[in-house]
């Protein structure tokens, strides 16, 4: 699973996921399913935000490539992926500036057009079940919830899906591709089932034991699907700034 994650996701996403896990004392090399889940969630958050802007008239527009000097503001503020201290600093700043109610839990995004925080969910289960779990945890009508599944289903607060259909289709296609690639490598069942994941971990540990009689060959071949759908989703004009902002280590 670890090899798959490093091949499948943008290096910045992988770096952010590793940083987040280490912040909570978790090891990406051991908890590989969580590593994959965090990377997937991060990527969906970035895809949700990418190419969506607000123009000088306050209208929401989609710009994939255009005049870099245009007076455009990113529609979404990305909160997910930052260390907790910086994330709360961003949330507090937004609340002080806009007057919106401060959430009890860290949200994933802030939508400057609709003036609301957004909680993004990516589930391997039924979307309505995961939606209810999120809603019961957050207990706030102010935070908008949007859930995606690996099967192409989605569910959002008051059926308000925020994004246009094409943008949401990009996210669904990416999730479906991840699922298909995991399945083709025999990783999907363990990703869905914790019990199967434990069995797979024991199996992997046994395979990693030194053996005098044989050598293990590791294939780094990338499948045609991954070559075609490698994560080129990230807004290139934003990548450098995000990397500097998100990966900056706080001074201790």
UniProtKB/Swiss-Prot annotation:
Provide the alphabetized UniProt keywords.
Decay of host mRNAs by virus, Eukaryotic host gene expression shutoff by virus, Host cytoplasm, Host gene expression shutoff by virus, Host mRNA suppression by virus, Host nucleus, Host-virus interaction
Give the positions of the site Important for efficient shutoff activity and nuclear localization: 195, 198-199
Q: Where is this site: Important for efficient shutoff activity?
A: 202-203, 206
The record's listing under Gene3D superfamilies reads: Influenza RNA-dependent RNA polymerase subunit PA, endonuclease domain (3.40.91.90)
Molecular-function GO term, any one: RNA binding
Q: What is this protein called?
A: Protein PA-X
Record's comment describing the protein's domains: The probable endonuclease active site in the N-terminus and the basic amino acid cluster in the C-terminus are important for the shutoff activity. The C-terminus acts as a nuclear localization signal. The C-terminus is recruited to host protein complexes involved in nuclear Pol II RNA processing.
Q: Where does this polypeptide localize?
A: Host cytoplasm; Host nucleus
What are the coiled-coil residue ranges?
none
What's this chain's function? Plays a major role in the shutoff of the host protein expression by cleaving mRNAs probably via an endonuclease activity. This host shutoff allows the virus to escape from the host antiviral response. Hijacks host RNA splicing machinery to selectively target host RNAs containing introns for destruction. This may explain the preferential degradation of RNAs that have undergone co- or post-transcriptional processing.
Q: Which residues form the active site?
A: 80, 108
| Cleaved signal peptide residues | none
One GO BP annotation is:
viral RNA genome replication
**Assigned protein family:** Belongs to the influenza viruses PA-X family.
| Main location, first listed in the record | host cell
């Amino acid at each position: 699973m670890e090899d798959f994650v490093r091949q499948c996701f943008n290096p910045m996403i992988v770096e952010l996921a590793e940083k987040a896990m280490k912040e909570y004392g978790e090891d990406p090399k051991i908890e590989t399913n969580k590593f994959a889940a965090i990377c997937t969630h991060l990527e969906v958050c970035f895809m949700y935000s990418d190419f969506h802007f607000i123009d000088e008239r306050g209208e929401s527009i989609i710009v994939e490539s255009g005049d870099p000097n245009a007076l455009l503001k990113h529609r979404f503020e990305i909160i997910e992926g930052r260390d907790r201290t910086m994330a709360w600093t961003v949330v507090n700043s937004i609340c002080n500036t806009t007057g919106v109610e401060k959430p009890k839990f860290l949200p994933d995004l802030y939508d400057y057009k609709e003036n609301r925080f957004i909680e993004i969910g990516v589930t391997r289960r039924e979307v309505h079940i995961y939606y209810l779990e999120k809603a019961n945890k957050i207990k706030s009508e102010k935070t908008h919830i949007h859930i995606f599944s690996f099967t192409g289903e989605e569910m959002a607060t008051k059926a308000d899906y925020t994004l246009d259909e094409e943008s949401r289709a990009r996210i669904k296609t990416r999730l479906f591709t991840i699922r298909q690639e995991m399945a083709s490598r025999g990783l999907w069942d363990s990703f869905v089932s914790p019990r199967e994941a434990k069995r797979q971990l024991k199996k992997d540990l046994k395979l990693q034991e030194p053996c005098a009689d044989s050598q293990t060959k590791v294939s780094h071949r990338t499948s045609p699907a991954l070559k075609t759908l490698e994560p080129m989703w990230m807004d290139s004009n934003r990548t450098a700034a995000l990397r500097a902002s998100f990966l900056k280590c706080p001074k201790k």
